[in-house]
């Protein structure tokens, strides 16, 4: 089995189990917020991530750190889920489980994820315009925007919705013009 296959065979059932617990307690969105909180902790602190995924770190130490960081900030069910991941030595898959839970939650709420890459930070007006355009294209009730900056685009934006990519960047236009000119030769 490849690393990806192993990862998905672990990540998906755990995320689905978390969703099941969340649904049975009417906490899907609240646990979604908890998941986002934990993901932001992992993405902003490499030290925390390394500490949690290190197999040599004692489980009691991992639990103590999570108690300090998250116990009072997240739903009891989600905190117990985190402890379960430590007990089962699955905490190394936490980031993947959280991302898959977010995908399940988006599906449940008829929300799409639009990954937007631009040369500069988007204004609120631009975010609103992109959100409206994506809603219209996808027929989704809501849109989650994930933005990133890439100065190599020169200008414009690239919007990725699932497997569909809309390249409205200057770099993309130059690449298409180059292909057209090359094909004429």
Swiss-Prot record:
Claim: Ion transport is one of the keywords in the record: yes
UniProt GO molecular function: proton-transporting ATP synthase activity, rotational mechanism
Pfam family, any one: OSCP
Predominant subcellular localization, coarse grouping: membrane
Keyword Signal: no
Record keywords: ATP synthesis, CF(1), Hydrogen ion transport, Ion transport, Membrane, Thylakoid, Transport
GO cellular component: plasma membrane-derived thylakoid membrane; proton-transporting ATP synthase complex
Subunit structure: F-type ATPases have 2 components, F(1) - the catalytic core - and F(0) - the membrane proton channel. F(1) has five subunits: alpha(3), beta(3), gamma(1), delta(1), epsilon(1). CF(0) has four main subunits: a(1), b(1), b'(1) and c(10-14). The alpha and beta chains form an alternating ring which encloses part of the gamma chain. F(1) is attached to F(0) by a central stalk formed by the gamma and epsilon chains, while a peripheral stalk is formed by the delta, b and b' chains.
Function according to Swiss-Prot or TrEMBL: F(1)F(0) ATP synthase produces ATP from ADP in the presence of a proton or sodium gradient. F-type ATPases consist of two structural domains, F(1) containing the extramembraneous catalytic core and F(0) containing the membrane proton channel, linked together by a central stalk and a peripheral stalk. During catalysis, ATP synthesis in the catalytic domain of F(1) is coupled via a rotary mechanism of the central stalk subunits to proton translocation. This protein is part of the stalk that links CF(0) to CF(1). It either transmits conformational changes from CF(0) to CF(1) or is implicated in proton conduction.
HAMAP family membership: ATP_synth_delta_bact
Recorded family membership: Belongs to the ATPase delta chain family.
PANTHER family, per the entry: ATP SYNTHASE DELTA CHAIN
Name of the protein in question: ATP synthase subunit delta
Native source species: Acaryochloris marina (strain MBIC 11017)
Gene: atpH
């Amino acid at each position: 089995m490849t690393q990806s296959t192993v990862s998905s065979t672990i990540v998906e059932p755990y995320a689905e189990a978390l969703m099941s617990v969340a649904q049975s307690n009417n906490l899907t969105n609240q646990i979604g917020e908890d998941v986002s909180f934990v993901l932001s902790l992992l993405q902003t602190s490499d030290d925390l991530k390394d500490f949690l995924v290190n197999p040599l770190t004692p489980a009691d130490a991992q639990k103590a750190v999570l108690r300090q960081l998250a116990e009072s900030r997240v739903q009891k069910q989600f905190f117990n889920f985190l402890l379960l991941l430590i007990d089962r030595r699955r905490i190394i898959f936490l980031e993947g489980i959280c991302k898959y839970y977010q995908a399940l939650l988006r599906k449940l709420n008829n929300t799409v994820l639009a990954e937007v890459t631009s040369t500069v930070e988007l204004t609120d007006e631009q975010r609103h315009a992109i959100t409206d355009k994506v809603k219209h294209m996808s027929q989704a009730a809501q849109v989650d925007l994930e933005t990133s900056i890439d100065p190599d685009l020169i200008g414009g934006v690239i919007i990725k919705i699932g497997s569909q990519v809309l390249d409205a960047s200057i770099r993309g236009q130059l690449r298409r013009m180059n292909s057209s000119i090359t094909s004429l030769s």
